[in-house]
């Protein structure tokens, strides 16, 4: 992926304001609520029977933070995203058997969460840069599948 200087600035500038715990928890919770079939990968998390249960589930919150913390590695390594996610791609493919389409869905959900949290600061140019980033991360995570 080739990044313009402006794209890098938009991504890193916004990332510096992101509350990883809150945004990560919200993104994973939204994924599980909006796309309920993704819950099958989180059976060990206990009660995911309703939106209220998902939103209040401490395991969802903790894993959401872990996911978004990992996403931060992409922000730090914009020019080497494929290698940054090589091990996670292998884990999700070989051991967890996650449908790679779910990575794209989570990326789209993250865009919604960022827009909700940052409003006007999440300008169309900023959204375009972040959309490019979430696509690159989803592609890197799906790499082991091909």
Swiss-Prot record:
The family database entries (Pfam families) matched by this protein are listed as: Globin (PF00042)
Q: Which residues form the Globin domain?
A: 2-146
Binding sites annotated in the UniProt record for heme b: 63, 92
Is Cytoplasm one of the keywords? no
Q: What biological process terms from GO does the record include?
A: hydrogen peroxide catabolic process
Key words, A-Z: Heme, Iron, Metal-binding, Oxygen transport, Transport
Which segments does the entry list as coiled coil? none
Question: Which InterPro entries is this protein grouped with?
Answer: Globin (IPR000971), Globin-like_sf (IPR009050), Globin/Proto (IPR012292), Hemoglobin_b (IPR002337), Hemoglobin_oxygen_transport (IPR050056)
GO cellular component terms given for this protein: blood microparticle; haptoglobin-hemoglobin complex; hemoglobin complex
Tissue-level expression reads: Red blood cells.
Keyword flag Metal-binding = yes
* GO molecular function term, any single one: heme binding
SUPFAM superfamilies named among the record's database cross-references: Globin-like
* Quaternary structure, from the entry: Heterotetramer of two alpha chains and two beta chains.
What family does the database annotate? Answer: Belongs to the globin family.
Its function? Involved in oxygen transport from the lung to the various peripheral tissues.
Name-wise, this protein is: Hemoglobin subunit beta
Report the source organism: Accipiter gentilis
Q: What gene name is given for the protein in this entry?
A: HBB
